[in-house]
Amino acid sequence: MKVRRNLLIALSLLSISASAQRIKGSDTVLPVAQQTAERFMNQHPDTRVTVTGGGTGVGISALLDNTTDIAMASRPIKFSEKMKIKSAGEDVAEIVVAYDALAVVAHPSNPVKQLTRQQLEDIFRGKITNWKQVGGDDRKIVVYSRETSSGTYEFFKESVLKNKNYMASSLSMPATGAIIQSVSQTKGAIGYVGLAYVSPRVKTLSVSYDGTHYATPTVENATNKTYPIVRPLYYYYNVKNKEQVSPLIQFILSSDGQDIIKKSGYIPVK
């Protein structure tokens, strides 16, 4: 009996040490989630963490369906999503793991250096259609956006468009990387991406919300709040799984985890 009890204890410990966790959702959070998960697995070799994107809405839907343990989100969970969880007798916890600046990007050859929030609203709503209307070349503006399931799509709509609708002819991209690629190949293009995705292939534009003070999207400007388009990034998990996910969440909030976040182009919470 004692041998059997010891065997059961050993098997229980093995199942804990060899635990697997699934993280799914926001493409904005994806790069830093992958990096922190890799470091976590290096420190805990018996733990496997899988990280996949798809968008905030996809991640939260997966959390509702119990096909992920943690949902990455670049927007707060919606009331309707919370109600679905509560109707199933469950509860969800929210953790802010980082902050992100949303950069407005254009083709590198574009001479325009800055735009106001109102100009951005008019561009993404189709009221401004040519770059010459904002001091640029006589060239049609090609608007790239994220698809509607994206938290970045919803945040940009809320912060920049003041909850007005995007123009019907904007080109919806399935992932942030697709916006970078499309904007880098299209001279009249404009789009928006998380700061960590910015590369020399595109040009970032300075933005002003008051029409006077312009700021470029950098970690420093986002941290000191001179750059206006900044939002929190979230991890959501089912409260009943707290014990399982806590070690990973504690790691991303630790000094090591927050250091990874800062080096990756995000703004730490601590």
Where are these predicted regions, by residue range?
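Bacterial N-terminal signal peptides that target proteins for export
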Residues: 1-8
